Amino acid sequence: MRFGVNLLIWTANFDASHLPLLPRIRAAGFDGVEVLMYKGRDFAVDALRKGLADTGMECTICSVMVDDLSLVSDDAAIRAKAVEQLRENIATTAEVGAKIIAGPMYAPVGYLPGRRRTAEEWKRAVDCWQQLGPWLAQHEVTAAIEPLNRFETYFLNTAVDAARLCDEIGHSNVGILFDTFHANIEEKNIADGYRTVARHLKHVHTCENDRGTPGSGHVEWMQVFEAIKEIGYDGWLTIESFGSNLPEIAAAAAIWRDLASTPEAVAFDGVRFLKKMTA
């Protein structure tokens, strides 16, 4: 297993000014960092590459749909722009040296049209990711599509649907990011959710039920790690939380209070817990 932490605890816009964070993160016991990428053209590629080289860490990339772009829009022009944005981000992911780009890469987070998704929207997402599959393979990058809870998206919520989506996409470079925070809301049993997505599981977010420190809430971690071991997953375990001092991110994630004594305590206490659970 490799242990990662999303830099959204500290910043939503990584640049060279954040490089001093990386040695501290390394010293806390992490193998890598996860960095948010909005648009590849604006990403601090050189700064991140330097920070990783200096610390011996690796990275993964997380991404979301920006500028109201969507793979499920009924407007073909919007879908085409969304595919091009993802192509750009995939290429930049490879340029950084990362192998994973993960996130709810289908529709904007928080877009809730007040109805169920349609069969046509589903087909659009499948078609778009089938277009992107060869581009991912060319760049030796894997996309891990993330189901979110029902309060953040209407399109993809459950392990069953995520596995079916990847079955229909049918490309080995397209899989699933499964996050315990969202699974705690949407799954009857989180561990069984991991078993359901096993054949497509590419990335894991180890997050507590309140997005606080792993091990401090009611996620049944023993069962989760038993399932992860059972299915043979040996990739990243990444802590994702959000600093309350980042208003735009805190508002989007509905973080209205402190989740720990300090935002970074979620990460530094959390990784000790994860290492204990996986020892």
Predicted regions located by residue number:
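Active-site-proximal loop/turn and secondary-structure-junction residues that shape catalytic pockets
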Residues: I9-T11, M37-K39, M65-D68, M105-V109, ...
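A short acidic, helix-capping loop that chelates divalent metal ions and anchors anionic groups
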Residues: D68-S73, V109-R115, F151-E152, I185-E186, ...
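Catalytic domains of carbohydrate-active enzymes, especially glycoside hydrolases
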Residues: L19-K39, N89, V96-G97
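Active-site-adjacent beta->alpha loops and helix N-cap segments on the catalytic face
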Residues: R41-G51
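Residue-level detector of anion-binding/catalytic polar loops
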Residues: D31-G32, E58, K99, T142, ...
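Active-site acidic/histidine proton-transfer and metal-coordination neighborhood
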Residues: D54, A76-G175, R257-A265
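Histidine-acidic metal/acid-base catalytic patches
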Residues: M1-L7, T11, D15-R26, G97-K99, ...
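Conserved beta-strand positions in the central sheet of alpha/beta enzyme cores
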Residues: E34, I61-S63, A102, A144, ...
